[in-house]
Design a protein with these regions (language model features):
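Amphipathic alpha-helical segments used for helix-helix packing
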Residues: 95-122
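N-terminal intrinsically disordered/low-complexity leader segments
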Residues: 1-9
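Solvent-exposed, amphipathic alpha-helical segments
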Residues: 13, 17-24, 71-74, 103, ...
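Short, basic, alpha-helical segments at the C-terminal edge of helix-turn-helix-like DNA-binding modules
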Residues: 62-67
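Hydrophobic alpha-helical connector segments
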Residues: 59, 70-101, 146-153
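Helix-turn-helix
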Residues: 13, 17-55, 59
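Short, solvent-exposed amphipathic helices
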Residues: 120-127, 131
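Hydrophobic/aromatic-rich alpha-helical bundle segments in the mid-to-C-terminal region
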Residues: 117-122, 138-188
């Protein structure tokens, strides 16, 4: 009797491999052929799970975003760090964070022309804003305009992450953390 195949698990594994290729070499590296080779599958196996490259790339994006969310959630439940410090886990302060940002930034040009991906990007941005808003309120329950300040903080986080992704030597984890903490203090005044 053939071994049972967990199709969701295999689909997730292919999405993870595509994300790994994107992190290492950019979107152009994540062809169906390259992903199949990296997975040790035929292209037929990959196309069984994904109708085309676009569907595979969308799954890779979702995998990366959900992994970053999972990392944040795990940190939030595992440690006593203050809420604003926990948000630092969303920055490229280590290899896992740098990988996530390299993937995320590869999709920006696509989201400009792909409505489904743009919707996905907007949802994750709104999710990030809500995580930040909740942290700001937790640190300072009497904060005024928590929504507006959360949007500003998300912009700060994005700016730090972009700089650190493109200039990791100039933006080590210590500088990212110091900049994030300083900007959050300004918002909480």
């Amino acid at each position: 009797m053939p071994a049972a195949v967990d199709h969701d698990e295999k689909r997730d594994a292919i999405a993870r491999i595509a994300a790994d290729l994107i992190a290492a070499r950019g979107l152009d590296a994540a062809t169906i052929r390259q992903v199949a080779a990296a997975a040790g599958y035929s292209t037929t196996v990959v196309t069984h799970y994904f109708a085309n490259k676009r569907a595979m790339l969308l799954a890779a994006y979702r995998h990366a975003a959900e992994s970053a969310q999972g990392r944040f959630d795990a940190l939030a439940t595992e440690c006593n760090a203050d809420p604003l410090s926990r948000l630092e886990s969303l920055l490229p302060i280590d290899e896992e964070g740098r990988r996530a940002w390299r993937i995320y930034l590869q999709y920006w040009p696509l989201a400009d022309h792909d409505e489904e991906l743009a919707i996905e990007q907007r949802w994750w941005s709104a999710n990030g804003t809500e995580l930040i808003r909740a942290a700001l309120v937790q640190v300072c329950p009497e904060i005024d305009d928590a929504d507006g300040k959360a949007a500003i903080a998300l912009s700060v986080l994005l700016g730090i992450a972009i700089q650190a992704t493109f200039d990791p030597a100039g933006w080590p984890a210590s500088r990212q953390s110091a900049m994030w903490q300083a900007q959050c203090k300004l918002l909480l005044r």
